[in-house]
C-alpha cells in the first residue's frame, strides 16, 4: 500500500522548508503523493511540481488552504487540484495576501508602540514572498526572548482577545467555496475538530453551510486525532457522501512534533483516499 499526505506547508506561507525541500522530505518519508497547501497562496506549487518531476518517485498535488469565517469562528478549507495558473484565481489570492499584509503591518505597529521592536523583514525571515501568519510573529517573539515558546506567544500576545491580535478581514464560505470550484479544485474542510466545535456543531456547519456551497470532503485523518476521532469523522462524512481526506498539517520547525506523512508517529493515510478523490473528480468533471 502507498501512503499520502494531503495537507502540507512550505516557506510559501508559514512552513520552515522550501517547496523543493518539502518534496525531498516527502519522498524520503516514503510517500507516493502529497498536496502542497500553503495558507492563502499557491506561490510554492510550481517549484514543488518542477522539483518532483526532476527527482522522480513523488507526485505533487497543487493545493491551498484558505481561511474564512463561520460566524465568529475562523475555519479552513483546503482546495485540492486547483489550477494554480488560473489568472482569476491567482488575482483573488493576491488580494487576500494583500489584506493579510495590511493586518500584519498594523500588528507590527502595535508591538513597536508597546516597546517590542518587530519588523516585517524579521517576520519574512529571508522569504520575501511568504504569506505571513501569526506563527511568524510567534517565532520572532521567541527568538527575541519575549516569550519562551510559541504557546506563550499565542496565549499572551497573539491569540484571539489578546492585546496584539487583529482579525483578518472577514472572508466567508460563500466566497471561498465557489473560488475553489471555479479554479477546478476539490474543496475539503480542514481539521474539523480544531475549531472547538462539538460533533453536532460540525454537522450543522456541514449541512447548513458548506455542503450546499459545494464542499466535497472532510479531513478525517489528522496528526492530533486519535482513532476514535478519525472513525467518528469518517462516519459523519460517509453519512453525507463526503470524501474522506487526511493530512499531517506539516510545517517543519514551527510544529516540530509533526512529521510529514506520519504526524506524531501514528498517522498513515492510505492512497485509497486519493483514488476516491480522483474518481469523484472524473465523475464531476
Positions of the model-derived regions?
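Generic low-complexity, intrinsically disordered sequence content enriched
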Residues: 46, 237, 264, 277-278, ...
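Extended substrate/RNA-proximal surfaces in nucleic-acid metabolism proteins
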Residues: 51-208, 267-285
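Conserved, well-ordered active-site substructure
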Residues: 258-270
Amino acid at each position: 500500500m502507498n501512503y499520502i499526505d494531503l495537507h502540507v506547508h512550505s516557506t510559501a506561507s508559514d512552513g520552515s522548508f522550501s517547496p523543493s525541500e518539502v518534496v525531498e522530505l516527502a519522498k524520503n518519508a516514503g510517500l507516493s503523493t502529497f498536496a502542497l497547501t500553503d495558507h492563502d497562496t499557491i506561490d510554492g506549487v510550481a517549484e514543488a511540481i518542477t522539483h518532483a518531476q526532476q527527482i522522480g518517485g513523488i507526485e505533487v498535488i497543487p493545493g491551498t488552504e484558505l481561511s474564512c469565517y463561520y460566524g465568529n469562528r475562523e475555519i479552513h478549507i483546503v482546495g485540492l487540484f486547483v489550477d494554480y495558473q488560473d489568472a482569476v484565481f491567482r488575482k483573488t489570492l493576491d488580494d487576500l495576501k494583500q489584506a493579510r499584509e495590511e493586518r500584519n503591518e498594523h500588528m507590527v505597529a502595535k508591538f513597536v508602540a508597546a516597546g517590542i521592536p518587530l519588523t516585517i523583514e524579521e517576520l519574512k525571515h529571508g522569504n520575501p514572498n511568504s504569506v505571513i501568519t501569526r506563527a511568524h510573529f510567534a517565532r520572532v517573539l521567541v527568538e527575541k526572548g519575549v516569550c519562551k515558546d510559541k504557546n506563550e506567544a499565542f496565549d499572551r500576545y497573539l491569540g484571539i482577545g489578546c492585546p496584539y491580535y487583529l482579525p483578518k478581514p472577514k472572508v466567508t464560505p460563500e466566497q471561498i467555496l465557489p473560488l475553489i470550484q471555479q479554479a477546478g479544485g476539490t474543496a475539503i474542510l480542514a481539521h474539523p475538530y480544531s475549531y472547538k466545535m462539538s460533533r453536532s456543531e460540525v454537522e450543522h456547519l456541514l449541512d447548513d453551510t458548506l455542503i450546499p456551497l459545494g464542499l466535497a470532503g472532510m479531513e478525517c485523518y489528522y496528526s492530533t486525532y486519535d482513532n476514535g476521532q478519525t472513525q467518528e469523522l469518517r462516519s459523519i462524512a460517509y453519512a453525507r457522501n463526503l470524501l474522506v481526506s487526511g493530512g499531517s498539517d506539516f510545517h517543519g520547525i514551527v510544529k516540530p512534533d509533526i512529521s510529514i506523512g506520519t504526524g506524531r508517529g501514528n498517522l498513515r493515510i492510505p492512497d485509497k483516499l486519493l483514488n476516491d478523490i480522483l474518481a469523484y473528480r472524473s465523475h464531476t468533471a
